[in-house]
From Swiss-Prot:
<dbReference type="InterPro" id="IPR000870">
    <property type="entry name" value="Homoserine_kinase"/>
</dbReference>
<keyword id="KW-0808">Transferase</keyword>
<keyword id="KW-0418">Kinase</keyword>
<comment type="function">
    <text>Catalyzes the ATP-dependent phosphorylation of L-homoserine to L-homoserine phosphate.</text>
</comment>
<dbReference type="GO" id="GO:0005737">
    <property type="term" value="C:cytoplasm"/>
</dbReference>
<dbReference type="InterPro" id="IPR006203">
    <property type="entry name" value="GHMP_knse_ATP-bd_CS"/>
</dbReference>
<comment type="pathway">
    <text>Amino-acid biosynthesis; L-threonine biosynthesis; L-threonine from L-aspartate: step 4/5.</text>
</comment>
<dbReference type="Pfam" id="PF08544">
    <property type="entry name" value="GHMP_kinases_C"/>
</dbReference>
<dbReference type="Pfam" id="PF00288">
    <property type="entry name" value="GHMP_kinases_N"/>
</dbReference>
<keyword id="KW-0547">Nucleotide-binding</keyword>
<comment type="similarity">
    <text>Belongs to the GHMP kinase family. Homoserine kinase subfamily.</text>
</comment>
<dbReference type="GO" id="GO:0009088">
    <property type="term" value="P:threonine biosynthetic process"/>
</dbReference>
<keyword id="KW-0791">Threonine biosynthesis</keyword>
<protein>
    <recommendedName>
        <fullName>Homoserine kinase</fullName>
        <ecNumber>2.7.1.39</ecNumber>
    </recommendedName>
</protein>
<dbReference type="GO" id="GO:0004413">
    <property type="term" value="F:homoserine kinase activity"/>
</dbReference>
<keyword id="KW-0028">Amino-acid biosynthesis</keyword>
<keyword id="KW-0963">Cytoplasm</keyword>
Length: 300
């Protein structure tokens, strides 16, 4: 019976003006190991058996969808999440990691019946939008769009000196609620505001024009409404500027806040940790680099 292990990166999506469009893989990982078995599917977390109904498990659902698409006959699986460093419901692509991991594992078991494009299309169908699943699949920073059921994407070369500081609070932000707070329509001026900044963000990153990044990360589509779901977000962003950040944004739908740096990363981390320690909620601070590879098979 086949046994496969994968490593999947965390992702940060939206990145300011690129709502449901921009995303980037980060060097923070989950690892999933799956073995085909003849009996009933079993779920484990780091070797400890879970009481979770496997039918509701996103990894299992993604495996089944992939195998059904590939016409592969299966019985059951032993699914073991051996590493889970991507925090759940914090805007760092935890659901995308499950989906992409499940699809990659299933395709490997099937003998790679599906092409990369097929896997991306399927992952987007399961997730509902491409901005997390595409970078989780291919790595790097990615612009993604949907045309019907077809997904198109383009990778962006990032300057090597850029680092990203994830400020992760102890509280979650529900994705459904974070979409519910958004307005049903926008003014033309607000749309132009975002289109111009999203376009310039891609150009500024490509050209290494770091002085433009803070303006480019501005947004009027989602962050003004979602920041109220993240306690102290305005004050934290102000402190990030004070401590040397060159750009800030809400990661995905939150609750993680992201700061962008091109120098003095260690000093920034020390300063922001000291500030966050004085707030009511607990915050975890992680210095991250982009992951350029995406999901990968790991030797067992």
């Amino acid at each position: 019976m086949a046994k496969v292990k994968v490593r999947i990166p965390a992702t940060t999506a939206n990145m300011g003006p690129g709502f449901d469009t921009l995303g980037m893989a980060l060097k923070l990982y989950n690892e999933i190991e799956v073995e085909e078995i003849n009996g009933k599917t079993q779920i484990y977390n780091n070797g400890l058996k879970s009481e979770e109904d496997f039918g509701n498990n996103l990894i299992y659902k993604s495996i089944i969808e992939t195998m059904n698409k590939g016409g592969y006959s299966y019985k059951g699986f032993k699914i073991n999440v051996v590493k889970c460093d991507v925090p759940i419901s914090r805007g760092l692509g935890s659901s995308s990691a499950c989906i992409v991991g499940g699809i990659k594992i299933a395709n490997e078991i099937m003998g790679n019946k599906l092409e990369l494009k097929d896997m991306i299309d399927l992952a987007t169908k399961i997730e509902g939008h491409p901005d997390n699943v595409v970078p989780a699949m291919v790595g790097g920073m990615v612009v993604s769009l949907k045309t019907g059921e077809d997904i198109k994407y383009s990778k962006i070369d990032l300057p090597k000196q850029l680092k990203f500081v994830a400020m992760i609070p102890s509280f979650q932000v529900n994705t459904a609620l974070s979409r519910k707070v958004l307005p049903k329509s926008y003014l033309k001026e607000e749309c132009i505001f975002n289109i111009s900044r999203c376009a310039m963000l891609v150009s500024a990153l490509y050209n290494g024009e770091f002085d433009k990044l803070r303006t480019c990360f501005q947004d009027k589509i989602h962050q003004p409404y979602r920041k109220n779901l993240i306690k102290n977000s305005d004050d934290i962003f102000k402190k990030a500027v004070e401590f040397g950040s060159i750009g800030e944004f809400i990661s995905g739908s939150g609750s993680t806040l992201m700061a962008v740096l091109n120098k003095n990363e260690d000093e920034f981390v020390i300063s922001i940790k000291r500030y966050l320690s004085g707030l009511q909620d607990k915050w975890n601070v992680i210095l991250l680099e982009p992951d350029l590879e995406g999901v990968r098979i790991v030797k067992i």
